[in-house]
Amino acid sequence: TRRSSDLVKLQGTEKSVSTVGGEMFHASAVIIATGASWRKLNVEGEAEYIGRGVAFCPHCDGPFYQGKHVAVIGGGNSGIEAAIDLAGICRKVTVFEFADTLKADQVLQEKARSLPNVEIFTSSQTIKVDGNGEKVTSIRIKDRLTGEERDFPLDGIFVQIGLAANSAPFRNKLETTPTGEIKIDAFCRTTLP
């Protein structure tokens, strides 16, 4: 099995990219458009219930939770916007933010707090996603100030803790930021000629 980093050769005037199937492409330039993936919580039960109660796109999956109770993990702009959007669909939306304060813009925080079916908890660490083998049934949250753990019964969880760059095949070949984004200049060029 070849590693993804073995599929790319960017040195010299001719660049090459090969597919997992062995097909090879050669060019004088390569456009890298690998995008990003949703960051995951990496807690017990999350992977097991992705698509069965753990979701990442409130616009895509929100309608499946009409009239139900959901959690949004993340108190940045994406998380609070998701909570506001889901509040129009769901019976109840509970937001859990790891930090002591929300990071979302103040106007979004005010809107979310004004909604009667949105509840917000800060200093909240997600410990575990629980389910019945078919779907999510609850989430375990640890209060980071008191150490107390509590199970919240609910129907769905929307993870909104940011995106991770899909740049793994290029990380040893191009200069990247500490979070994995490929560094470019004002003309979208990498540091390689």
What are these regions (language model features)?
Residues 5-19, 24-27, 32, 88-186:
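A Rossmann-like FAD-binding core segment of flavoenzymes
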Residues 64-67, 152-153:
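Flexible, charged surface loops at secondary-structure boundaries
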Residues 37, 42, 48-64, 159-193:
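FAD-site-proximal beta/loop scaffold in flavoenzymes
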Residues 1-3:
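Single conserved hydrophobic/aromatic residue that forms the stacking wall/gate
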Residues 74-76:
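Glycine-rich Rossmann-fold phosphate-binding loop(s) that bind the pyrophosphate
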Residues 79-80:
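N-terminal Rossmann-fold NAD(P) dinucleotide-binding loop
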